[in-house]
Amino acid sequence: MAEPLALRSPDPQQEPPAWQPLNSHHRLVNELWRLGQVHAAWEAWQAQADPAVPPPPEERLAEGRLRLAVGDTWMGLDQLWWLSLRWRNPSCHQRTLLHRSQFPRLFEAEIQTAAEQAGVQANLLRAIAKQESRFAPGVVSPAGAVGVMQLMPSTATEMADAPTSTLMLKDPADNFELGARYLNHLLEQWESDPFRSIASYNAGPGAVASWAQPTDQDDDALWVERIPYPETRFYTKKVLDNLLGYLGGNQSFCNETGAGMGQKRAGDDASDHDQTHQKQADPGGGQNTDADEIEPGQQHG
């Protein structure tokens, strides 16, 4: 196998994302955003929006960023994802901002604390939380997985070595802490192999153990393509894609002349979005849902 991603080493040093103006068409909204009054900016944007007139792409970008800022991560990330597929000929600055907005750094204190305590990379927690719940703390899946890391209650209780509750698991700090412990457990089980660890988070380690295991001659990507569960194969690709997005940090899509450069990443097309409805049952003790399968109405479940 190729050299594995070092998901248990400290995160690479990254500059925090620089503040960016909203660039809405509405002056009041822009000013409130500049002042850090994001909830007031969102209310002002809603008051000025005309539902009868479809907003242009740059205004949809502003709306998606506003939704993320006020905690509507479910709709915000969904809107930004669709915009990334449909926006024709954005400027390089718009393309860069759209890409970065799809990898928000939310719950930073909770994630950093959980990652340091468990000995896993914070970027891995971000990558999984984005796919599992879109960072929505109140999400409860039809199978009963709860919170930002979509922990099954039985897994959470095992990691806590004490009884847990749905209310507790809806708290981001507790959920990230227990989710990070579970990730560390999987990484230990699979000798720090990121591919089997990520697949196990979705399908359960028992299922992954039953599959053909990679050898020294195998290419990592080839092993992922051979995952027999379509949903887990898709899930693993998306989490790795998220991880690369977060590791990219302040990546720019402008070349030296300022011209736009391509943004589309592996897995970012409509057919991949539809694949999330082909969910396999979780045969193990791990999480068994991802963000694209949970109905929006469930995020406060």
Segments (PLM) and residue ranges:
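Short, strongly patterned local motifs
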Residues: 255-301
